[in-house]
């Protein structure tokens, strides 16, 4: 996907997202226009559109509306059915779990189960696990625009989401092998539910859903960034207190502790980064990004990765943190997924109403499925590292 033919797909995907950003700026500039204010004023459209809230979140709204239109026209269903058919025939998975895995490539982990709504109640535990792992291992198309804003390659993001879908099915079957008899359903014959009655209503429904998603993202980022800062301050304070008692009564050679959440994440996930093939010099920062992705969410991880790529992150000594291009590519794949602790509750809350009597199964599978999604993303990252430079 990345190399054939000569990177045309990557260039096309990157150009597509760049074009979308330009179209969104037209609508955003009109909404946030302030004609009576001088150029360069903080409320000037061009200044506002450089911020996350006014420059990126409108892209989510537009993309959600566009996806809804494509869904109404039947193009989304055609693409999802095609991918589901390939996975069902090559991997031997059931129709519902193949269909959900294919849908996860394009939509979110709470929207994908709606594609197989009539079948969720009768799914086996192995199929339920596959449904959840697939959601944790991929990202939605609407969120790709946000990560592109951070400087992440749209081509790599799309490739990561595509190859993580079958990888998620493989990991899911390893974690929860099929011991029951799944209901025989052909993925191609499954008809996703159609809501809109015309293309205008489809655009309106998509825009409305996009607004809800944008507001949710805004609140989540504000809360999680504030909580992360609070936790970091607590860890640093504990480190300073520990350092004081260790050095109490010592003469010279004082212990200098640099405790922080970043250092904690780095130490915990350093081995995983090394196993993925990241060179030792980048394992510390890669482990930190993996930790933030799992403990907090992928937004924070990609945001910091973008700042590292721009040379805006400094280490404890005041030196600019860097990473090699190969590490950047591997981490793009490793971070591409909803596998974090908060997403467990979101996914259970999204799938639960479709099959209330399966809530206990969903709760039991939640943590395992989240780690399965993380492993699937890391597995695709390993493949990206192997293929890098070919």
Range-by-range predicted roles:
Residues 1, 60-69, 138-146, 161-176, ...:
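Hydrophobic core segments of alpha-helical transmembrane domains in multi-pass membrane transport
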Residues 80-115, 182-202, 244-251, 261-267, ...:
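Juxtamembrane inter-helical linkers in multi-pass membrane proteins
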Residues 88-147, 287-371, 375-383:
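Alpha-helical membrane segments and immediately flanking helix-loop junctions
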């Amino acid at each position: 996907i990345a190399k054939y033919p000569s990177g045309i797909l990557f260039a096309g995907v990157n150009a597509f997202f760049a074009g979308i950003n330009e179209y969104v700026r037209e609508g955003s500039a009109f909404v946030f226009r302030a004609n009576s204010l001088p150029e360069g004023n903080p409320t000037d459209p061009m200044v506002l559109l450089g911020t996350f809230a006014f420059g990126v979140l409108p892209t989510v709204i537009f993309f959600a509306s566009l996806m809804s239109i494509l869904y109404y026209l039947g193009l989304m269903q055609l693409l999802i059915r095609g991918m589901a058919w390939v996975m069902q025939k090559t991997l031997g998975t059931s129709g519902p779990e193949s269909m959900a895995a294919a849908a996860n490539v394009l939509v979110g982990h709470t929207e994908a189960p709606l594609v197989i709504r009539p079948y969720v109640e009768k799914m086996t535990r192995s199929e339920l696990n596959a449904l959840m792992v697939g959601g944790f291992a991929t990202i939605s198309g609407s969120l790709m625009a946000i990560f592109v804003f951070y400087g992440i390659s749209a081509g790599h993001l799309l490739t990561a989401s595509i190859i993580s879908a079958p990888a998620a099915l493989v990991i899911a079957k390893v974690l929860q092998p099929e011991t029951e008899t799944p209901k025989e359903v052909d993925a191609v014959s499954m008809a996703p539910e159609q809501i809109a009655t015309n293309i205008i209503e489809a655009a309106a429904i998509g825009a409305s859903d996009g607004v809800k998603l944008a507001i949710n993202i805004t609140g989540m980022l504000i809360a999680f960034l504030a909580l992360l800062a609070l936790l970091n301050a607590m860890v640093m304070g504990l480190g300073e207190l520990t350092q004081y008692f260790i050095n109490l009564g010592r003469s010279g050679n004082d212990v200098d502790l640099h405790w922080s959440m970043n250092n904690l994440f780095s130490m915990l996930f350093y081995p995983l980064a090394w196993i993925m093939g990241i060179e030792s010099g980048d394992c510390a920062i890669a482990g930190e990004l993996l930790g933030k992705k799992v403990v907090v969410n992928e937004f924070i991880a990609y945001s910091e990765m973008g700042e590292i790529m721009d040379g805006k992150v400094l280490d404890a000594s005041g030196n600019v943190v860097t990473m090699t291009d190969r590490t950047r590519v591997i981490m793009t794949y490793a971070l591409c997924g909803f596998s974090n602790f908060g997403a467990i509750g979101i996914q259970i809350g999204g799938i639960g109403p479709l099959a209330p009597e399966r809530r206990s199964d969903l709760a039991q599978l939640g943590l395992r499925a989240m780690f399965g999604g993380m492993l699937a993303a890391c597995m695709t990252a390993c493949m990206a590292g192997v293929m890098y430079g070919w």
